[in-house]
């Protein structure tokens, strides 16, 4: 109260080791392949000091992460708005003693919003993957990267698309985590 900056999240009663572990493992999974390419001398070059870059890996990874922009937009609209709207109504009704009919209706809407959101993310990401597969050879050629790296781009695009789906599912699970109620 009246503080400009608060570190209440670090209080022991608000610290959830399982959530910390999930976040840590999620981020390690995202970054481990990059560190492998950056710090394996045959696939990387020194940039400044201990920083390294891998031209053959970094550009396909960058392109694959560009391909998730449509899926992230759908995620933001469907999960972070539609689902959260019904989530809030559901828990407000539960806490304030709403009718069983209304609570069940909000639960059904919440489930429907999740189904719609995940379905739309899957459709949009599949389309983004297919477009990247088709445009991949031209993209690599325009960037001066050998077409031998096309399979790497394909794997990265599919992986990035799956990452969007995993992030959406984890987000729903985090919302439904009842420790914070």
Question: Which residue ranges define each predicted feature?
Answer:
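Lipid-exposed faces of alpha-helical membrane segments in multi-pass integral membrane proteins
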Residues: 21, 25-28, 67, 123-131, ...
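Alpha-helical transmembrane segments of integral membrane proteins
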Residues: 10, 14, 18-22, 120, ...
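Specific pore-lining/lateral-gate transmembrane helices of multi-pass inner-membrane transport
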Residues: 58-140
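Short runs within selected transmembrane alpha-helices of multi-pass transporters and secretion channels
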Residues: 1, 132-134, 151-181
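Short juxtamembrane and helix-loop transition motifs at transmembrane-helix boundaries
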Residues: 113-119, 144-151, 171-176
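Hydrophobic alpha-helical transmembrane segments and immediately flanking/interface helices
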Residues: 39-59, 128-149, 157
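Transmembrane helical elements of multi-pass membrane transporters/channels
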Residues: 1-80
């Amino acid at each position: 109260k009246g503080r400009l900056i608060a570190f209440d999240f670090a209080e022991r009663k608000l610290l959830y080791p399982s959530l910390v572990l999930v976040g840590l493992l999620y981020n390690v999974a995202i970054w481990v392949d990059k560190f492998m390419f950056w710090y394996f001398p045959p696939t990387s070059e020194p940039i400044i000091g201990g920083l390294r870059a891998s031209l053959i890996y970094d550009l396909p990874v960058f392109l694959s992460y560009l391909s998730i922009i449509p899926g992230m937009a759908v995620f933001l609209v469907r999960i972070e708005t539609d689902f959260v709207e019904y989530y809030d109504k559901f828990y407000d009704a539960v806490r304030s003693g709403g009718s069983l009919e209304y609570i069940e209706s909000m639960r059904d809407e919440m489930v429907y919003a999740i189904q719609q959101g995940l379905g739309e993310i899957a459709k949009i990401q599949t389309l983004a993957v297919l477009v990247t597969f088709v445009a991949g050879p031209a993209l690599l050629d325009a960037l001066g990267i050998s077409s031998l790296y096309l399979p790497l781009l394909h794997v990265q695009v599919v992986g990035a698309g799956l990452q969007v789906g995993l992030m959406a599912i984890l987000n729903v699970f985090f919302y439904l985590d009842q420790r914070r109620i």
